[in-house]
Amino acid sequence: MLDQKLIRENPTSVEENLSLRGKVYKISHIHELTVKKKEIDIEISSLQSESKKLSKLISQVIGKSQDNNSQELNDLKKKGNEYRIKISELEEKQRILNKKVDDEIYNLPNFPSKDAPIGKDESENLQIKTWGDPLIKENIKSHWEIGESLNIFDSIKSTKISKSRFITLIGNGARLERALINFMLDMHTKNGYLELMPPALVNSESLTGSGQLPKFSNESFKCSNDDLWLSPTAEVPLTALHRNELIDPKHLPLKYVAYSPCFRREAGSYGRDTKGLIRLHQFNKVELYWFCDPSKSLEAHKEITTDAESILKKLNLPYRLVDICTGDLGFSSSRTFDLEVWLPSSKCYREISSCSNCLDFQARRSSIRSKIDKKNTYIHTLNGSGLAIGRTMAAILENGQQTDGSVKIPDALVPYFGSNLLKTA
């Protein structure tokens, strides 16, 4: 979340920074709420101070006088009771006002980085580089055509089981998925990440801390009888892991990697990517996550992106690196680098990883701090897919397809898959 002090003291600057996202943000009403909140905070603090002084005075009067029912003492006690009533009334106003302020500020996105390219939407994202040679030739099959011919996944039966946009992996398809998960986890743990396996169900406070709630409640699946949601990404439980904690600075950076199933409604994608593995309600992903010193998050952002890139390079999958423009940034991100893998059937690159620096945005929402330079400071959080499993499988199927209908397995994956070819069982 954004700093309330900044909203209170410089609302114009806040509006200008948010406008870089290509949308007009008017926060005058939030500014008024934060000013009123500060006034009440000061008034409560002043009354509490006066109440403490009065308590000391009452103790002194009692100590000096043998008459515990004197007029002076009764007047002081009456005044003390008035203080308590007034403080209680103000604290109730404070509680209501705090909720109003939080409800408003929780809906404001992060400030875009001054280094992010200015733009209105994905058409103005900036390509930084490409890697590998994209496969371009005639008669290229799509990954879902390959999957069906090799009988490695089935969407029709999955629709019968659940609904559309679900997939059942079969035989070598399930085996390939498992191989990819193990390969990615091994790569990242060798690179200094601690492997975690968090819960797939998360509460509302966790989703609020990472930025999914309250704005994106319609994009996630909620359990009707509990305050629990199916996690849309491991970013959510990994952020919540240290909620309300003061992390010892000597432990920073904390680098986590987690495989998890992810669940999304894909509410705004009707009619898009209806076939195959690209856009599903349930998919698997390996997530990278950092907690770091604020002074080191820019370098950490480069490193987490390089770590995600290393998987694509090991699998010999052509990709490009894209700097996301201000108008296309995710809600919690200040700057994002996307990795997009080449899918020859559609003759284009498709997102396979987003590596984001959220600065202190999630740490403020989750109250995660560290004592840095003798001051309790909100730390910075970073996240990135390392990688999305289904999209990686789609890229392997399309880029590795052979004329006989089989698929060449990348060399780095052979020890995990157990064969250098994927073919009909």
Swiss-Prot record:
Keywords: Aminoacyl-tRNA synthetase, ATP-binding, Cytoplasm, Ligase, Nucleotide-binding, Protein biosynthesis
EC category name: ligase
Subcellular localization(s) per the UniProt record: Cytoplasm
GO biological process: selenocysteine biosynthetic process; seryl-tRNA aminoacylation
Keyword Aminoacyl-tRNA synthetase: yes
Pathway participation: Aminoacyl-tRNA biosynthesis; selenocysteinyl-tRNA(Sec) biosynthesis; L-seryl-tRNA(Sec) from L-serine and tRNA(Sec): step 1/1
Pfam families for this protein: Seryl_tRNA_N, tRNA-synt_2b
The EC number(s) this enzyme carries: 6.1.1.11
One Gene Ontology CC term in the entry: cytoplasm
Positions contributing to L-serine binding: T233, A234, E235, E287, S385
Gene Ontology molecular function, alphabetical: ATP binding; serine-tRNA ligase activity
Domain comment quoted from the record: Consists of two distinct domains, a catalytic core and a N-terminal extension that is involved in tRNA binding.
PANTHER family per record: SERINE--TRNA LIGASE (PTHR43697:SF1), SERYL-TRNA SYNTHETASE (PTHR43697)
The family this protein is said to belong to: Belongs to the class-II aminoacyl-tRNA synthetase family. Type-1 seryl-tRNA synthetase subfamily.
HAMAP family in the cross-refs: Ser_tRNA_synth_type1
Protein name: Serine--tRNA ligase
